[in-house]
Amino acid sequence: MGLQFRILYAKNDGKDGTSVFDLPQTANATGFCGSDSSSLTLTFHDDAFNVTFDFVKSARRTGASRFHVSAIEISYTELSSFFPGTKSPDGRRQVKNNTMDIFSADADKSYMCNTDMNITVTKDVSILVRKVQLQPFGVKSGQFSWAQVCSQDSGDKGGVNIAAIVIGVIAGVALLAGVFAYVIMSEKKRQDYRSLNSD
């Protein structure tokens, strides 16, 4: 899974700056797993940055349970190496969105998406997520369960199927048009032949 953070911040010169940085491979992952809720916290750059994803499991009308990310919280320090010219060097910030409904899948499956997704946490903070597979509940032997693919990925496959259907319909219409043209031409030749015989 790849995460890229984009954070707007105030600069000394009165202008706005944009800090863009990736989740390093050395990030530390912690969390907890409950029966209906779980969380994943990623900590990196000597605890200067923390991002927490809260997952919940809920029953649907069909009786099947599903999970999704319900909240994302990001706390960070405005380090000058990531926030050049910041108005608040070493200032600590915290943002949270409790109204998220992303990364949804059946509770007994994993969620997988290869398409890049831009997640808006607040008006000033967003996360670009790349090639994600996650499963907050029911992990067995450290392995993901069967993956439920996101609509963005399955939509691409659906586009291929639609193209095949359209080509098939066009070929069928062309074949029918050819058959009708042959029947009409045959009937016309037959009528011309009869009119010659009657003379």
Language-model segment annotations:
Residues M1-V149:
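Non-cytosolic ectodomains/luminal loops of secretory-pathway membrane proteins
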Residues C150-D199:
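C-terminal single-pass transmembrane alpha-helix
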